């Protein structure tokens, strides 16, 4: 897709690298847009956008959709240079970074909502939840959702205002076109140190800092929530007498999502974080840097796709467990899991078929 006129601006080996990055970025961004759009469409058609369980995932998918569109636009603009490409690329990349940070925060927000949902299900089986507690949790959730949109925008205001006023976009697309190397806020060219150059340099490191710090905070928050959720899940296992099989299927689905969404988050952004750190420490012409560029193009643009896969797979597992649980309704009086374990323990060891029929779902 790259035009011959662009060859002059790229060093020999880097021209091939950026051409490969363009195709990788285009493909992964397209898949991410399709994946996030499918979750959004599913939530809308099921009329579940306002559901407390679906709303955080809807906003996370919306952020992934806009992020994928930014990646897609960058890949397309790489092969179709315009007269104001430097200005467009600079602001497109800054816009993309808003959605990077928003995606981090919405992932934390969704993981927290999953944990709260798990905790409320646990408490509801032990004691009745007061309406005040439910309203309080709902209010906190709305504040977190609004903050996840507002904070990234406010963080990037200096990049838009100071960067454009200081002409930091000059020669911005000279090397990499409009491919979104998300940690690469424009550095000034070889020129005497001026106030404008100092501002651009500050914006460069500010952009990297915002990305790395927001990722670190989000990652720590997710680890804390994950550890709390695992402890709560163990309490569920030890209190199986309170749960029927259909309830247990729901608990298992929520617990899986608490685990797999953070894993998808880390897989998507770990190469990009390493790339941002390397840009501050070593030359950007090293082979490690080149490898991370390719790995980043494969992972960072794919969060919408991975989130869609996680949601679809956990939903499939939930429906499968629920169907298995419903078989008791057609054959016998439904049993609690503790009752099934008791009856299973009283069966002789020589009856594997009967034992298999009374085993727990896990």
Which residues make up each language-model segment?
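Seventh transmembrane helix
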Residues: 256-277, 289-348
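Helix-to-loop junction signature of class
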Residues: 2-4, 22-25, 66-83, 96, ...
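Extracellular/lumenal N-termini and interhelical loops of multi-pass eukaryotic membrane proteins
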Residues: 1-14, 156, 160-199
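Class A (rhodopsin-like) GPCR signature focused on the TM5-ICL3 interface and adjacent 7TM helical core
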Residues: 107-119, 158-167, 205-242, 259-279, ...
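Extracellular N-terminal segment of 7TM GPCRs
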Residues: 1-38
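Fourth transmembrane helix
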Residues: 102-183
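Extracellular TM2-ECL1-early TM3 structural module of rhodopsin-like
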Residues: 17-22, 53, 58-127, 131-132
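Intracellular signaling interfaces of 7-transmembrane GPCRs
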Residues: 47-52, 116-141, 223-256, 312-341
């Amino acid at each position: 897709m790259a035009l011959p006129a662009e060859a002059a601006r790229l060093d020999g080996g880097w021209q091939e690298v950026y051409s490969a990055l363009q195709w990788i970025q285009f493909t992964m961004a397209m898949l991410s847009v399709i994946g996030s759009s499918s979750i959004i469409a599913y939530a809308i058609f099921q009329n579940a956008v306002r559901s407390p369980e679906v709303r955080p995932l809807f906003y996370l998918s919306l952020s992934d959709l806009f992020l994928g569109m930014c990646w897609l636009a960058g890949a397309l603009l790489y092969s179709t240079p315009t007269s104001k490409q430097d200005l467009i690329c600079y602001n497109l990349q800054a816009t993309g970074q808003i959605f990077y940070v928003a995606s981090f925060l919405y992932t934390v927000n969704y993981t927290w909502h999953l944990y709260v949902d798990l905790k409320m299900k646990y408490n509801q089986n032990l004691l009745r939840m007061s309406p005040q507690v439910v309203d309080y949790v709902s209010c906190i959730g709305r504040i977190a959702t609004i903050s996840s949109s507002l904070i990234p925008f406010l963080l990037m205001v200096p990049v838009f205002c100071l960067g454009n006023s200081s002409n930091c976009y000059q020669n911005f697309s000279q090397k990499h076109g409009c491919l979104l190397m998300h940690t690469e806020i424009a550095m000034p060219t070889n020129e005497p140190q001026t106030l404008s150059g100092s501002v651009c340099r500050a914006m460069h490191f500010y952009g990297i800092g915002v990305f790395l710090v927001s990722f670190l905070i989000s990652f720590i928050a997710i680890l804390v929530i994950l550890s709390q959720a695992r402890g709560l899940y163990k309490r569920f296992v030890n209190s199986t007498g309170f749960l029927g099989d259909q309830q247990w299927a729901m608990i298992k689905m929520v617990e899986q999502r608490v685990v797999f969404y953070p894993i998808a988050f880390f897989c998507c952004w770990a190469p990009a974080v390493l790339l941002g750190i390397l840009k501050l420490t070593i030359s950007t012409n090293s082979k490690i840097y080149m490898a991370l560029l390719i790995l980043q193009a494969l992972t960072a643009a794919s969060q919408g796709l991975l989130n869609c896969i996680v949601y679809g797979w956990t939903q499939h597992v939930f429906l499968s467990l629920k169907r298995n649980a419903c078989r008791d309704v057609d054959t016998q009086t439904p049993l609690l899991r503790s009752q099934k374990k008791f009856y299973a323990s009283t069966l002789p060891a020589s009856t594997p078929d009967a034992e298999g029929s009374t085993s727990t779902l896990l």
